[in-house]
């Protein structure tokens, strides 16, 4: 049978209001009474309901997390950083997978609000205009981390994809690349746009032109990388920039199966740097996004909003670095 606040109050011979004050950390309780109530709570194994506690404290110490797919290695690293900081600040997380479905995202968002969460963090994927409107109208703070399609009015944490693309393109040109292609997916359109901006800026400065810009029809997966290579096979560039590691590996394996030498004849670089990049041969060159930190900093930013702390910068840009491994010269 579930132990209730009434059971604790009866056993400790105090009012339910006193038990509530002890549970919520109210200082206006005598030490002797507090110790007695805590002893009964421990003995009866009473677990306060977060929403019930929230009625007294106006907080549930619960945050909602909207994530495209936690089984994806990219998103799981973001989620781990978030969760560690949430625990550090005594918050519990309700994690919901949206599957990059805009309708499902809206449903999850409204469901989390109905659960009286103290804040919501949106991890990865792309924010639609409709979702931006929901966020701007939200009754609780919302932070987006590692998410494409950011808005200046929405608190966010990410890297600068445009600057990363400019660095990569310049380096590959130095190594002899004269023709380039960009491969991304429909769920990373904004990141792809930012990469494209940096790529074309450097190409224009060097009087070079961009070849293919391919949007994969589905998620940024190995299979989509294989399909992308098939489309480019008759007119391969010197270098391919891929938004995801899985796409890049699909392209690399397809190229090698076709007898094309990587990186001598085709250079490949990605923007995720998940654990996969070191599990393939040659190892994949990649932009190192501090995925754990992006999740962690996003959660810390959310705790500041939830606790009315001073916010120095609502749109945080974390540093990146580029690891040139075996798929580039």
UniProtKB/Swiss-Prot annotation:
It comes from the Bacteria. SUPFAM superfamilies: lambda repressor-like DNA-binding domains, Periplasmic binding protein-like I. Residues 1-57 form the HTH lacI-type domain. It comes from Staphylococcus aureus (strain MRSA252). PANTHER family: ARABINOSE METABOLISM TRANSCRIPTIONAL REPRESSOR, LACI-RELATED TRANSCRIPTIONAL REPRESSOR. GO terms for molecular function: DNA-binding transcription factor activity; transcription cis-regulatory region binding. PROSITE patterns: HTH_LACI_1, HTH_LACI_2. The gene is ccpA. Keywords: Activator, DNA-binding, Repressor, Transcription, Transcription regulation. Global transcriptional regulator of carbon catabolite repression (CCR) and carbon catabolite activation (CCA), which ensures optimal energy usage under diverse conditions. This is Catabolite control protein A. Residues 5-24 bind DNA.
């Amino acid at each position: 049978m579930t132990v209730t606040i009434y059971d604790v109050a009866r056993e400790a011979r105090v009012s339910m209001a006193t038990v509530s004050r002890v549970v919520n950390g109210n200082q206006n309780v005598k030490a002797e009474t507090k110790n007695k109530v805590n002893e009964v709570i421990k003995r009866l194994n009473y677990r306060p309901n977060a929403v019930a506690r929230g009625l007294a404290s106006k907080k549930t110490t619960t945050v909602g997390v909207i994530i495209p797919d936690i089984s994806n290695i990219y998103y799981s690293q973001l989620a781990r950083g978030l969760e560690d900081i949430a625990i550090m600040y005594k918050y519990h997380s309700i994690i919901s997978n949206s599957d990059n479905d805009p309708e499902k995202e809206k449903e999850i968002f409204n469901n989390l609000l109905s659960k009286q969460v103290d804040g919501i963090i949106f991890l990865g994927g792309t924010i639609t205009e409709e979702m931006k409107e929901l966020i701007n109208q939200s009754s609780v703070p919302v932070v987006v981390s590692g998410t494409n399609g950011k808005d200046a009015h929405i608190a966010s944490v990410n890297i600068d994809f445009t600057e990363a693309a400019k660095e990569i393109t310049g380096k590959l040109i130095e190594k002899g690349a004269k023709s380039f292609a960009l491969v991304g997916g429909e769920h990373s359109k904004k990141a792809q746009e930012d990469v494209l901006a940096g790529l074309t800026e450097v190409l224009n400065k060097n009087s070079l032109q961009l070849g293919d810009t391919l949007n994969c029809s589905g998620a940024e997966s190995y299979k989509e990388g294989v399909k992308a290579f098939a489309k480019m096979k008759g007119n391969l560039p010197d270098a391919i920039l891929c938004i995801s590691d899985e796409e890049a590996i699909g392209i690399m394996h397809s190229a090698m199966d076709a007898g094309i030498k990587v990186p001598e004849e085709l250079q490949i670089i990605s923007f995720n740097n998940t654990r996969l990049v070191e599990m393939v041969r040659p190892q994949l060159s990649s932009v190192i996004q501090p995925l754990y930190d992006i999740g962690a900093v996003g959660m810390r930013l959310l705790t500041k909003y939830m606790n009315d702390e001073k916010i120095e910068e609502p749109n945080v840009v974390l540093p990146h670095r580029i690891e040139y491994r075996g798929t580039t010269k």
